[in-house]
Every structure is written in structure tokens, then in C-alpha cells.
Amino acid sequence: LRKIDAIAVVASAILVAIVWRFADAPITAFAERIQSSNIQDTIRIANRFGGGMNPAMVIFFFLVAGVVYRHHRWIAYGVAMAFAGAAAGVSVQIVKYTAGRTRPELWLGPFHHARAAATSFPSGHTVGAFALAGVLMLASPSRTMRVIAFLLALSVAVSRVMAFRHWTSDVLASAAIGMILAAIAVRAVMTAEVSFRE
């Protein structure tokens, strides 16, 4: 782990702890106050980016487009996304059932833990979205692609809070987990000499 990586992990942990302690409940209360049918429609669209078959379709797109158009970088993106996505799926299930944090929709408060039915932390949608988007954010030379990837992943994270499926600290920590998995996948693919350059 490089020094900058360690600093980013520590800073993320401190931010998550502060939000968990002081901001989770007020942010969720604010989300409840601003609910509308338009916001609900937007939440449904954003949720689709992070769940179901959409992550697999993104990976498939990069692999196929890379092969068809002979863009080795896109193939490398697809391979790194596949590794990051698989790691996200496994790690989310392990942590989710170990942490036992209750979801905001149960209205038990941000400090309530009940292992049997509590699956708020981490947000699988957010970990997956940032794991895949993180590959592009870390490896793509295109600023436009990096910004679009970040905004799509961010929309997933915000939608999970607005849908009362996760606390804000859940999605912040989940975004950090996703980025860590993306960094590991990018380094693994680069080490295996799959080129991110044309």
C-alpha cells in the first residue's frame, strides 16, 4: 500500500465515523422531508445502475467492444471490472451478515444492530458501482470517462440513501470499499501485463 493510499483509507474511515456519529439520522430525516414522486422515479433509475444484471452488462460491454474494436485498454477495463465486481459481491455478503446494521427504513436509529435481519452495511449497490466505476476512475486517461463513471456511481450511492435502504455512513464506507477493490483489480491486471494503454 502506497503512503497516499494509506492516507486515503484513514481519511475515509474518519469521515465515515464522523458521519455515522453525527449526520446519519439528520440526513435520513432530510431525505424523508423532500420525498416526491419525481424523486422516487429518479431513485428507481439510479438504483438500476448498481444492481441486477447491469454491472454484468457493463463488464460484457467493455470486453466485447474491446475485442470488436481491438481496444486492448477496454479489454483490460473489462477484466479489471470483472475481478473488482466478483470481489465486491463476495466481500459485501461477508461483511453485511457480520456487521448486522439495521436499515433506515426500520426506523430503529443509526446505532441499532440486530444481526439476524439487519443488512444495511455495506451497500452492495454502492460497493459494486464504485468497484466498476473505480476501474475507469483510476485507469482511464479520458477525463470525461472518469467523470461520467464517478457521477453514475455517486447517483447509485445517493439513491440508496434516498430510498431509505442505507445510512449515509453505509454508502460512504461502501464507496471506499469499492474504490479499494477497484485499485486492487487495476493493479492486478496491470501486474499481469494486460495493458491499459493502446
Regions found by a protein language model. Name each.
Residues 1-61, 96-118:
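N-terminal transmembrane-helix/juxtamembrane module of multi-pass inner/ER membrane proteins
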